[in-house]
């Protein structure tokens, strides 16, 4: 496979603003540096399901990531592509679980102070996991009864404390980081792709 050309400053600016062409997304996926923290996970055959459906079915084992979810890929890629000055001020996110853990472990890896806002209704096991993955660099704030409440509180804190918000979705760098899962499937199974979900 031919290596993608490096992005120019203009390409990167356009990408960061969410106005990128599909080929720029592909370039960002192929050059994402998520493997500083994420694992290259297995693609395991699902033999029983394959027999039942009459097709070859495999499972991408993202449950083998350090936070048991693909969400670490997007969180880390976003933080790796955030200017150092913004990271130095600290980051904040809102999440009920997997993205929160991804930001926490990424903050610990990068030595960044992070505030993680989770709903008060989040399972205690998720809150404990966020604290464990983040260690002393992470502060967990419980706010509201829903993700929407936690998100609103995180936005308020971000504005008041000049923190950089790390979104869980709808961000080009988060999407590209999470897209690295697909690039691994492509490498693992180059000739047998009919449907991916």
Can you name each region flagged by the protein language model?
Residues 1-188, 192:
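PLP-dependent amino-acid enzyme catalytic core
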């Amino acid at each position: 496979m031919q290596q993608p050309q490096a992005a120019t400053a203009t390409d990167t600016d356009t990408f960061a603003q969410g106005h990128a062409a599909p080929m720029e997304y592909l370039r960002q996926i192929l050059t994402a540096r998520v493997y500083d923290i994420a694992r290259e996970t297995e693609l395991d055959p699902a033999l029983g399901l394959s027999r039942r459906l009459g097709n070859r079915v495999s499972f991408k084992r993202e449950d083998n990531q350090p936070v048991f979810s693909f969400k670490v890929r997007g969180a880390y890629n976003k933080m790796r592509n955030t200017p150092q000055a913004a990271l130095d001020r600290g980051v904040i996110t809102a999440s009920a679980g997997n993205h929160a853990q991804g930001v926490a472990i990424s903050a610990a890896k990068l030595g960044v102070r992070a505030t993680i806002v989770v709903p008060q209704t989040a399972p205690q096991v998720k809150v404990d996991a966020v604290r464990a993955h983040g260690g002393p660099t992470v502060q967990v704030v419980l706010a509201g009864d829903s993700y929407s409440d936690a998100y609103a509180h995180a936005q308020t804190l971000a504005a008041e404390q000049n923190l950089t918000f790390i979104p869980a979705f709808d961000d080009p760098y988060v999407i590209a980081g999470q897209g690295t899962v697909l690039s691994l499937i492509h490498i693992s199974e180059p000739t047998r792709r009919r449907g991916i979900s």
